[in-house]
Amino acid sequence: MSGETVHGISCYSVVANTEDTYNQTLDFYQKLGFKKVASFGTSDSDNARVCNESLREDWMHVAGNNSAESVTIKFRLVPGELSLSPAAEDSEWRGQKSSLVFYYPNLLDLLKQLSADAIKYQAFPNEKKPDEVYVEDPLGNLIGFSDRYNPFAHANLKKSEESGAASNLESGLATPVVETLKKATTSDKPAGVKKKIAVMTSGGDSPGMNAVVRAVARIAIHRGCDAFAIYEGYEGLVQGGDMIKQLQWGDVRGWLAEGGTLIGTARCMAFRERPGRLRAAKNLISAGIDSIIVCGGDGSLTGADIFRSDWPGLVKELEDTKAITPEQAKLYRHLTIVGLVGSIDNDMSSTDVTIGAFSSLHRICEAVDSISSTAISHSRAFIVEVMGRHCGWLAVLAALATGADFVFIPERPAEVGKWQDELCNSLSSVRKLGKRKSIVIVAEGAIDSELNHISPEDIKNLLVERLHLDTRVTTLGHVQRGGIPCAYDRMLATLQGVDAVDAVLASTPDTPSPMIAINGNKINRKPLMEAVKLTHEVADAIEKKQFAHAMELRDPEFADYLHTWEGTTFIEDESHFVPKDERMRVAIIHVGAPAGGMNSATRAAVRYCLNRGHTPLAIDNGFSGFLRHDSIHELSWIDVDEWCIRGGSEIGTNRDTPDLDMGFTAFKFQQHKIDALIIIGGFEAFTALSQLESARVNYPSFRIPMAIIPATISNNVPGTEFSLGCDTCLNAVMEYCDTIKQSASASRRRVFVCEVQGGRSGYIATVGGLITGASAIYTPEDGISLDMLRKDIDHLKATFALEAGRNRAGQLILRNECASKVYTTEVIGNIISEEAHKRFSARTAVPGHVQQGGNPTPMDRARAARLAMRAIRFFETCRANDLGNDPSSAVVIGIRGTGVSFSSVADVENNETEIEMRRPKNAWWRDMHNLVNILAGKTFAD
């Protein structure tokens, strides 16, 4: 050979044959200070610098003072390649294998770090004054460290310092490994050493816990941290070892659709004692973990905060007993705790709802809906016991959603000696109207006003003896914990899991342990122990018979739902009637496409009208039915009895608006003496109300209180954050996508492009993508471009290459029906198939009107009843104050945060609406789009 000589090292490459060893190797070199600078997959096979056989490549670099002193290592994942045998421990490693030797000026610091990470090493000539140190990386490659920058030098760094030659070398000439480990003695974390965040589930399991673990793991990795799972709750924390495992990106694939907790939960008496917590602290420090995200109930979160308060003393004791080194004690002197509330009872104060509560409510309503058919068949009474030792949330919401006849809860106990008569009178009165079934919901903690327990058997015996009813008791028990998480719990768990990681990274030693809560539809952080204290106050208030205070400690929605159930359940009591001159004829009309909750709202409006002395009128088949066929009739109590559980529209609906014939519409209003109008529907209903309000100037019969209750699966009505039917639609889309994703996973290498409805609003596509784990979503707000498709296809190529045919490897793309006129669902599917080059396949799926759902979800039923009752109250206020012609008497009744809002339709139309696009100007859910991309691994892969 002749010519130019070698000037330096361009790069060094290592090859792994399994993904586990590949990831372990990346982690090993990152601890040494190497930074990832490039990532490649099979889609980059045309890049000459990438090995054609590589399924994955990551290039890592460490910078020196100039390019010749820098080091680049190419890591390659090539299945089937032979692995190196480990060196014999009883011999000198550097004589058995070739080695790559890095310069490092302070080998004593290095030995301390290797010991802390439990990495085996050999030091020469000895550990007290080493000149060279050797370790094996996870692939079996021998890596050396020397404090001689020049291998031909006879003097090491310490001797060179005497001659002034060390000033440049100590700054890290060849590698930032020097700076990385040298800073360990002056900061909480060595530079280049990742923060390690552990997640654990504790206490009773609840649906949505797996979504928490998935979100925490992926967001932690995305934020540059290492994610760990602590298996079997506090028991795993005390045992340590294999109970604490690192989570890789792919380990949590498919977890969104799983119920319970896949990392386990168990009771642990040992953790309640200091010796148990001491072992737990040792296990965490050994694993390098100083942050824990705990998902559980108030007991689990209390235990976590006690652990944090004990931490400094535990670390000192471990240091004093030499169980850990002084360096470890300094490095892990603080513990960060973040709490997430996983509880089906929804019994935690300071948050509107807990993870798992709505899924449990789904199970209860499914059971009661099923029981109803057999109860009607045999004219039976059923006593259904639900969970809730100190909280009646499940019982109240279940009673409201299923139309139960009576409910017993701990916060509002039945009056001792009187509840028996109240129950019997209530059930017998509806039986006289022709009702064939009786449903009584009982919380397991139900009591009377003297704190005597009320059991289902007590109620059964009463009904049998007094009313001679064929009565059965059904205890749902752990059925309430089972099943897949519902759409809301998946969304809530994901959003709170994301914020929990951010809370860890923002935490300081002086910050109180936060609890991630949701208040007013926003994720918030609350002081953990304050929330626990308020939760315990509820039980204390009940014990002290301070029942009003116990109700005050619950969230405002709870009391509102209880009042709604009372107002729509008990038979007309004339003592609650308004004065005769204030009684109204209230018309109810459905406008637009069917949506879950329309019938529930109608039922609640009818029953509350009757309870207040008003006359409810149903307009059949929308405005066209009203104008062409004079389709209007009164509704009675029993007419709407089963409507709360029915989907669709019992009185018929279409998209016609009153501008078909505004004058004739006004005549019909006058003819039937309509005093108030409830319009239940979507954007067409919003348009109809706007038209009627604008026509008041010409038609006096429209000068009455009017309101729209938004009901559309698209959730595109301005003036509210949620429309009735959107939760039912999300659950229908979720179940559909879970099914096709299962098919895609079975085929291993398949992606489904699923078209969802929503009009020009991307709500269903965006939130649907979040709760189903979609790889990509396309919405009208963002449109579709060729570059967008190219990036998503490249991402799919890389994903399928990395998954290498493993289970749960199916991919999903959600496309809104109006996202693009050019890039249709079929076109996108064909483009993906063509670009895949048979590495994977693409199929399209269009659920169509299946998305409207069957029976409405409990959330839509409860919201519908609440809004309908508030509408009647609003009409009464307008009537009493003679506001019929005031713009404020034509309103959109919506949900903003946890409260019910009344917004003038004129103001909403002028300030909050994109009329041409038929959607609100500001959508609270838009930020979720970026989160979908992150959790799909796009930003991570980049």
Swiss-Prot record:
Q: Which residues carry this modification: Phosphoserine?
A: S43, S45, S85, S160, S163, S167, S171, S600
Q: Where is this region: N-terminal catalytic PFK domain 1?
A: 1-570
Give the free-text PTM comment from the record. Answer: The N-terminus is blocked.
Its annotated compartments are: Cytoplasm
Similarity section: Belongs to the phosphofructokinase type A (PFKA) family. ATP-dependent PFK group I subfamily. Eukaryotic two domain clade 'E' sub-subfamily.
What HAMAP family does UniProt report for this protein, alphabetically?
Phosphofructokinase_I_E
Its biological purpose: Catalyzes the phosphorylation of D-fructose 6-phosphate to fructose 1,6-bisphosphate by ATP, the first committing step of glycolysis. May also have a role in cell cycle regulation.
Q: What is this protein called?
A: ATP-dependent 6-phosphofructokinase
